[in-house]
Amino acid sequence: MQTEHVILLNAQGVPTGTLEKYAAHTADTLLHLAFSSWLFNAKGQLLVTRRALSKKAWPGVWTNSVCGHPQLGESNAEAVIRRCRYELGVEITPPESIYPGFRYRATDPNGIVENEVCPVFAALTTSALQINDDEVMDYQWCDLAAVLRGIDATPWAFSPWMVMQATNREARKRLSAFTQLK
């Protein structure tokens, strides 16, 4: 895969430039555009993934299905589809927006900061997974209600963005409704 960049944003969310993805994520990460996606199978189960140990931020942490950064000239939906193919080897239905205004800043135990405007999407998988081990070290198909109970009981066991997304009342409602689309 070619070198990815992040789209830098000002405080109002207006693009101001780009920076190579690896260089962008430091102890003083600039605000940039990202996306987060929750994938469900035909049984209505949520795909929860464990980030590869080689990841710069939050290695080995359980999180929602797939996250990434749109590239210059790429729509969020195109970025979600691209990362699903790259990380999970899976085809999906058109991504649906479930939390368009999500923005967060969090610091991992190694001091790496995520500072993102990060719209959240959900989609159904339409093919079998072919996991890229460079991105994902483990995965499980889970009942959404069980995952949400786990997040409520042990938020430290999941990525901070997953916890923040799942504890937003409207996003939780939309995710729950999404499980009924099967």
Curated annotation (Swiss-Prot):
Which pathway does the UniProt entry assign to this protein? Isoprenoid biosynthesis; dimethylallyl diphosphate biosynthesis; dimethylallyl diphosphate from isopentenyl diphosphate: step 1/1
Give yes or no: UniProt keyword Magnesium: yes
Q: Which CDD domains match?
A: NUDIX_IPP_Isomerase
* GO biological process terms held by the UniProt record: dimethylallyl diphosphate biosynthetic process; isoprenoid biosynthetic process
Q: Short name of one Pfam family for this protein? A: NUDIX
| Source superkingdom | Bacteria
| Subunit structure of this chain's protein | Homodimer.
Name the job this protein performs.
Catalyzes the 1,3-allylic rearrangement of the homoallylic substrate isopentenyl (IPP) to its highly electrophilic allylic isomer, dimethylallyl diphosphate (DMAPP).
* Protein name (record): Isopentenyl-diphosphate Delta-isomerase
The source organism is Escherichia coli O127:H6 (strain E2348/69 / EPEC)
Q: Gene encoding this polypeptide?
A: idi
